[in-house]
């Protein structure tokens, strides 16, 4: 086999690249834009890592780089994370939980479920989706309350569609005196003129392929299409959509031990990564990797249990995992991935009891994290800020 080495800093003469048209391509490919050196060279930012053969002719080097043979993400723990603040931003319901966070048109939007309890115990105790808005992350105001008569709404997520709309995805379940009767995910869209969300609409799938509960989890948009997983009983499926409402099957995922909650993340070369919670066996989470058309997958055991998992790509090229930390006492924790794709705890957020389901937004060198916790009483919504070292 060929030996490879990581080159964290690589200086390339700028003038030949500009003359040949390569320079603009490299500016697009590098994680950080190239910057000019005093000697007329182009140097990638300090976080850019290239995987190149130890012995290679320049022509082959350019060809391989342009073909995308470099590290899409750095599978090593993130740079030091410093917790700079945490505050409770909502506690007006007996139970507020399951958060999502997005930066949309310069404002921060935080969504979550509010209800009387984690699961409806009596008829009429169905959950609603509350959305807060903030310009700076300091002061938060109520923006919307989305509800559906006779349906318990939960597990909300906000995303921006390819045509620029703000979309709310949420699960919708029917209960009678605490007994689950069935469920299907719903979507709602923000009207740009009225600044109100539409009534929740059930998603549409082929019922012959998904005859049971249709639970869509965390859509991630990539180009003109959105990808998500549907979990039902002990089966996990990858689906895609072009409008957020109609979903087609991509593949059945060969992931055992009752997989369910799944976060998705795309790499710069169309790689797709899955972070999957599992419920039986060892019940440890797994990490999946694939390339188009996303029908063949490689899986790695993370070595930890997951609860309400989410993913975030950091500016230094590392991947951050947010999940419930299941030790003697539960907490909401932030994890990195090492070279063997095992999770490593980096930071524990102020939390405890019924907690987790974080949302992530990166602004500059600050990571904003929404999550819920019951360490100060009933389950409430919190916002943490973490400084990212570059």
What residue ranges belong to the model's regions?
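Positively charged N-terminal leader segments that act as targeting/secretion signals
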Residues: 11-22
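Positively charged n-region of N-terminal signal peptides that target proteins for export
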Residues: 56-60
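Bacterial N-terminal signal peptides
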Residues: 63-74
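Boundary at the C-terminal end of the N-terminal hydrophobic targeting segment
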Residues: 74, 78-80
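Beta-rich carbohydrate-recognition and catalytic domains
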Residues: 80-97, 102-152, 160-353, 361-390
């Amino acid at each position: 086999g060929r030996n490879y080495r990581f080159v964290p800093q690589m200086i390339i003469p700028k003038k030949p690249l500009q003359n040949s048209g390569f320079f603009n391509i490299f500016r697009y490919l590098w994680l950080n834009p190239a910057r000019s050196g005093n000697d007329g060279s182009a140097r990638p930012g300090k976080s850019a890592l290239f995987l190149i053969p130890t012995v290679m002719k320049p022509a082959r080097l350019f060809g391989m780089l342009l073909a995308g043979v470099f590290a899409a993400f750095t599978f090593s723990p993130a740079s030091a994370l410093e917790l700079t603040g945490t505050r409770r931003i909502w506690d007006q319901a007996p139970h507020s939980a399951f958060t999502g966070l997005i930066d949309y048109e310069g404002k921060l939007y935080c969504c979550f479920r509010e209800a009387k309890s984690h699961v409806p115990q009596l008829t009429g105790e169905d959950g609603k989706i509350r959305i807060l808005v903030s310009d700076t992350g300091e002061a938060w105001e109520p923006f919307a309350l989305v509800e559906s008569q006779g349906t318990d709404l939960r597990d909300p997520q906000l995303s921006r569609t390819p045509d620029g709309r703000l979309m709310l995805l949420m699960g919708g379940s029917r209960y009678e005196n605490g007994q689950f009767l069935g469920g299907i995910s719903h979507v709602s869209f923000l009207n740009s003129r009225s600044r109100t969300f539409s009534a929740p609409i059930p998603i549409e799938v082929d019922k012959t392929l998904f005859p049971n509960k249709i639970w869509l989890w965390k859509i991630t948009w990539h180009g003109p299409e959105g990808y998500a997983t549907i979990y039902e009983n002990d089966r996990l499926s990858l689906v895609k959509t072009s409008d957020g409402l109609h979903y087609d099957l991509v593949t059945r995922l060969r992931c055992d031990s009752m997989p369910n909650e799944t976060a998705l993340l795309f790499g710069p070369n169309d790689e797709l990564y899955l972070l999957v919670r599992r419920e039986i066996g060892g019940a440890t989470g797994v990490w999946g990797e694939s390339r188009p058309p996303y029908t063949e997958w490689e899986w790695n055991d993370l070595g930890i249990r997951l609860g309400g998992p989410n993913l975030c790509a950091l500016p230094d090229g590392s991947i951050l995992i947010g999940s419930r930390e299941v030790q003697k006492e539960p907490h909401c924790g932030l994890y990195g991935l090492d070279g063997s794709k095992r999770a490593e705890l980096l930071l524990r957020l102020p939390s405890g009891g019924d907690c987790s389901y974080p949302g992530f937004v990166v602004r500059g060198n600050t990571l904003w994290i929404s999550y819920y916790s019951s360490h100060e009483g009933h389950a409430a919504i919190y916002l943490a800020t973490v400084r990212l070292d570059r």
